[in-house]
Amino acid sequence: MKTATAPLPPLRSVKVLDQLRERIRYLHYSLRTEQAYVHWVRAFIRFHGVRHPATLGSSEVEAFLSWLANERKVSVSTHRQALAALLFFYGKVLCTDLPWLQEIGRPRPSRRLPVVLTPDEVVRILGFLEGEHRLFAQLLYGTGMRISEGLQLRVKDLDFDHGTIIVREGKGSKDRALMLPESLAPSLREQLSRARAWWLKDQAEGRSGVALPDALERKYPRAGHSWPWFWVFAQHTHSTDPRSGVVRRHHMYDQTFQRAFKRAVEQAGITKPATPHTLRHSFATALLRSGYDIRTVQDLLGHSDVSTTMIYTHVLKVGGAGVRSPLDALPPLTSER
């Protein structure tokens, strides 16, 4: 990602939403971020009667955000995402350098303890997953990586000799090394064999290579056809790249895994609101419970601020951290009334 101080090139697009997409792609933001920002800027423009946003200012932004909070009843995280989209649009697309951009109120996120699964609950969920979905869930729990990071793993990111997995350009565009669970090595090798069959099939059919990071694709346009850059968890069918329009093989869809995981949680009789991201929370809590220091866990999770990691220490204190309830000190009741 480009630094905030780097000069931005002139925009070629004419329509404001196309300008927004152009700037997002230039700065290497993810497709999901692009879709979210376009959604919120479009909603903002429609909210104000399709007026050009260059004619709108602080009061109009505040009115839109108030409507989201008071009428739409959106969550704090959704509210903050909408604000981030507008700040990006005014700052990076319209290049508006006005004080009100930074003075707009930001709602404080609620501090909720993350949902954490016990080892027994993880085993029960895994028992209702099959094939690639089970392996992927094991990988998330065994490494603590985010679901997007796991889906974007390339063949070259797995180092069986050194027992490491490289997560490239994770959140914040930072690379980090994770442990490759020994118990998963055989299954991951089998997964690579299945992936190679898909790769060979694409090669034989003359298919387009897999998508690459923008700068790399421009510099090495044929790299996407090479085996090291192929997906570890490749989709079994081809689809159209929403940005380039090229028909190619994508990685496994996150929605497909999300649905499979949700079914497994229900079938396992887990009443906690568990999602795939819960496996990451459970990984962090398990390491802290095993005695690993907070800085080690921070590095493995890829947190830029240790305060983000500290939330898991609060999870360990649930139940009073060994404090005995005064109710348990009362003598037993002789009879019920």
Swiss-Prot record:
<keyword id="KW-0229">DNA integration</keyword>
<dbReference type="Pfam" id="PF00589">
    <property type="entry name" value="Phage_integrase"/>
</dbReference>
<dbReference type="InterPro" id="IPR004107">
    <property type="entry name" value="Integrase_SAM-like_N"/>
</dbReference>
<dbReference type="GO" id="GO:0006310">
    <property type="term" value="P:DNA recombination"/>
</dbReference>
<keyword id="KW-1160">Virus entry into host cell</keyword>
<feature type="active site">
    <location>
        <position position="303"/>
    </location>
</feature>
<feature type="domain" description="Core-binding (CB)">
    <location>
        <begin position="14"/>
        <end position="94"/>
    </location>
</feature>
<keyword id="KW-0238">DNA-binding</keyword>
<dbReference type="GO" id="GO:0015074">
    <property type="term" value="P:DNA integration"/>
</dbReference>
<feature type="active site">
    <location>
        <position position="171"/>
    </location>
</feature>
<keyword id="KW-0614">Plasmid</keyword>
<feature type="domain" description="Tyr recombinase">
    <location>
        <begin position="112"/>
        <end position="328"/>
    </location>
</feature>
<comment type="similarity">
    <text>Belongs to the 'phage' integrase family.</text>
</comment>
<protein>
    <recommendedName>
        <fullName>Integrase/recombinase</fullName>
    </recommendedName>
</protein>
<dbReference type="InterPro" id="IPR010998">
    <property type="entry name" value="Integrase_recombinase_N"/>
</dbReference>
<feature type="active site">
    <location>
        <position position="280"/>
    </location>
</feature>
<dbReference type="Pfam" id="PF13495">
    <property type="entry name" value="Phage_int_SAM_4"/>
</dbReference>
<feature type="active site" description="O-(3'-phospho-DNA)-tyrosine intermediate">
    <location>
        <position position="312"/>
    </location>
</feature>
<dbReference type="InterPro" id="IPR050090">
    <property type="entry name" value="Tyrosine_recombinase_XerCD"/>
</dbReference>
<dbReference type="GO" id="GO:0046718">
    <property type="term" value="P:symbiont entry into host cell"/>
</dbReference>
<feature type="active site">
    <location>
        <position position="146"/>
    </location>
</feature>
<dbReference type="GO" id="GO:0075713">
    <property type="term" value="P:establishment of integrated proviral latency"/>
</dbReference>
<keyword id="KW-1179">Viral genome integration</keyword>
<keyword id="KW-0233">DNA recombination</keyword>
<dbReference type="GO" id="GO:0003677">
    <property type="term" value="F:DNA binding"/>
</dbReference>
<dbReference type="InterPro" id="IPR013762">
    <property type="entry name" value="Integrase-like_cat_sf"/>
</dbReference>
<dbReference type="InterPro" id="IPR044068">
    <property type="entry name" value="CB"/>
</dbReference>
<dbReference type="InterPro" id="IPR011010">
    <property type="entry name" value="DNA_brk_join_enz"/>
</dbReference>
<dbReference type="GO" id="GO:0044826">
    <property type="term" value="P:viral genome integration into host DNA"/>
</dbReference>
<feature type="active site">
    <location>
        <position position="277"/>
    </location>
</feature>
<keyword id="KW-0814">Transposable element</keyword>
<dbReference type="InterPro" id="IPR011946">
    <property type="entry name" value="Integrase_integron-type"/>
</dbReference>
<dbReference type="InterPro" id="IPR002104">
    <property type="entry name" value="Integrase_catalytic"/>
</dbReference>
<comment type="function">
    <text>Putative integrase believed to be involved in the insertion of antibiotic resistance genes into plasmids and transposons.</text>
</comment>
